[in-house]
From Swiss-Prot:
Catalytic activity: acetoacetyl-CoA + acetyl-CoA + H2O = (3S)-3-hydroxy-3-methylglutaryl-CoA + CoA + H(+)
Lineage per the UniProt record: Archaea, Methanobacteriati, Methanobacteriota, Methanomada group, Methanococci
Keywords: Acyltransferase, Isoprene biosynthesis, Transferase
Protein name: Hydroxymethylglutaryl-CoA synthase
Molecular function terms from GO: acetyl-CoA C-acetyltransferase activity; hydroxymethylglutaryl-CoA synthase activity
Family recorded in the similarity comment: Belongs to the thiolase-like superfamily. Archaeal HMG-CoA synthase family.
Pathway where it operates: Metabolic intermediate biosynthesis; (R)-mevalonate biosynthesis; (R)-mevalonate from acetyl-CoA: step 2/3
HAMAP family named among the record's database cross-references: HMG_CoA_synth_arch
InterPro entries: ACP_syn_III_C (IPR013747), HMG_CoA_Synthase (IPR004656), Thiolase-like (IPR016039)
Sequence positions that bind (3S)-3-hydroxy-3-methylglutaryl-CoA: D30, A31, C114, T155, T205, H238, N270, S300
């Protein structure tokens, strides 16, 4: 296998936000207690003209801009999401066409709850590492759903990030040292056909689901690389809320200085398939040469993908070619609960 890594990355977020207070107020709930419990203050809201496809296209275009490559050299495009706009019509084809990739490539839409994006990255690593193609692109994006009044309403958000994987050493902005996955059959979160909103196991989504898989995925990666938390400069984990993320990070021995750039949920909500890709993009925006990054995703159902990544000196050349994730977070406009319901199509007759 060739050494492979990231040659370009890009992110995208909707401009709209809703505060936890507005959601709680509509349902007569204690906003401060909810914010303390979840460590989520506000979340992104997709506009009426935004969906997983539009977010993926924008993120992919920014990744191409940073990579500086010919899009027709990309041999595979994978879009991971649990909110593809069509049940039958691939988002990946839309993204590729909009970015000038088509038609000489392979594509697929991926689903594995919130880790479909990182699964796509692993697939790209294999295709490029085997020499089958020069570049491959993976996108993780979602416009997540939460039923009115459900706890998910405070966190289910929208956003995504794209990564272009390559093998030319002089083009790498970060190289993959290794990857590891941990998967079981765990029914913590699900949505059947024709259902508008997912169901979840409440507290069951914690210890036997999120923590079991994230911690085992992390420990498996560290065992494979013979490392501990002290060997890394930064880390990012899946973040259904801020509390789970911080708890997992601390249990693994990571400090706030290591996990702070990856933690976006308090200001963004849970972007599902976009959560870890977005957290990683923010870390890359702040990273410097030789920084080492520890990554663990999580997807309900359930599984985790882990990565060990080292940043190269080329990072300083590409960050400012596109808008950073932090700038996207800062560019926002608040909406109230009524507008939120309208934009999310939750008013049903």
């Amino acid at each position: 296998m060739k050494e492979v890594g990231i040659v370009g990355y890009g992110s995208d977020l909707p401009k709209y936000r809703i505060k936890a207070e507005d959601i709680a107020g509509a349902w007569g709930k204690d906003a401060q207690a909810i914010k303390r419990g979840l460590i989520v203050n506000e979340k992104s809201v997709p506009g009426p003209d935004e969906d997983t496809a539009t977010i993926s296209v924008q993120a992919a275009r920014r990744a191409l801009s940073r990579a500086g490559i010919n899009p027709k050299d990309i041999g595979a495009v994978y879009v991971g999401s649990e909110s593809h706009p069509y049940a039958v019509k691939p988002t990946s084809g839309i993204v590729a066409e909009a970015c000038g990739v088509s038609p000489d490539f392979t594509a697929a839409d991926l689903e594995f709850a919130c880790k479909a994006g990182t699964a796509g990255i692993q697939m790209c690593m294999g295709l490029v590492g085997s020499g089958m193609m020069e570049y491959a692109m993976a996108v993780g994006a979602d416009t997540a759903q939460g039923a009115p009044g459900d706890a998910l309403e405070y966190t289910a958000a929208a956003g995504g990030a794209a990564y272009i994987i390559g093998a030319k050493k002089e083009e790498l902005i970060a190289k993959f040292n290794g990857t590891y996955s941990y998967t079981t059959d765990t029914p913590d979160f699900w949505r059947r056909e024709h259902e508008h909103y997912p169901k979840h196991g409440g507290r069951f989504t914690g210890e036997p689901a999120y923590f079991k898989h994230v911690l085992n995925g992390a420990k498996g990666m560290m065992a494979k690389m013979d490392t501990t938390a002290k060997d890394y400069d930064y880390c990012v984990f899946h973040q259904p809320n801020g509390k789970f993320y911080i708890t997992a990070a601390k249990q693994l021995g990571f400090t706030e200085e290591q996990y702070k750039y990856g933690l976006l949920t308090p200001y963004l909500g849970n972007t599902y398939s976009g959560a870890v890709p977005l957290g990683l993009s923010n870390i890359l925006d702040h990273a410097k040469a030789d920084d080492r990054i520890f990554v663990v995703s999580y997807g309900s159902g359930a599984g985790s993908d882990a990565f060990d990544i080292t940043v190269t000196d080329r990072i300083s050349e590409v960050v400012d070619k596109e808008i950073t994730t932090e700038k996207l977070l800062e560019s926002k406009k608040y909406v109230d609960y009524a507008v939120y319901l309208k934009y999310r199509g939750k008013i049903r007759m």
